[in-house]
């Protein structure tokens, strides 16, 4: 998993749970043809975690990078009655069939992303999110199609608030 190592230190320091589901296919089902078994697996995994831990509905984020960022953005905005926050890193697309609730969204993208060019995605995502009333933090950064540690730190602060001192 390319994403988890960037979030684990924050989870340990700030005291939150991480659920890291994997797609059933080479990438998330929505990328290759709509919601299917990945969404069902995510629902089941979230229900299993909720059966063992008390979850704060005001602090439940869907997060991901690249195709996972697109999936988090699409599923999180569609299910804003479940997710209070969305952290989308280098998301290429946002596919929202319907929207429930209005999760807060942290959207980050590298200015020189060679795989998913920023100009083809982030501005359009930001416009759609703002037009539909979402609280949006847009975080461009200097870099390619990568996860940047300080950006993840900002995303966690947007999710949980700044750390207490």
Where are these regions (language model features)?
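Short amphipathic alpha-helix adjacent to the substrate-entry channel of hydrolases
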Residues: 1-19
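Stable alpha-helical elements in mature extracytoplasmic
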Residues: 3, 7, 38-45, 68-72, ...
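Loop/turn elements at helix/coil->beta-strand transitions in domains of secreted/extracellular proteins
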Residues: 13-18, 56-60, 81-85, 101-105, ...
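Short beta-to-alpha linker loops that shape the active-site pocket of alpha/beta-hydrolase fold enzymes
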Residues: 22-26, 92
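Gly/Ser-rich "nucleophile elbow"/oxyanion-hole loop immediately N-terminal to the catalytic nucleophile
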Residues: 29-66
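Solvent-exposed, acidic/flexible segments
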Residues: 31-39, 65, 76, 98, ...
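Primarily recognizes the serine-hydrolase "nucleophile elbow" in alpha/beta-hydrolase
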Residues: 50-52, 58-102
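C-terminal catalytic histidine-bearing segment of alpha/beta-hydrolase fold enzymes
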Residues: 106-108, 114-165
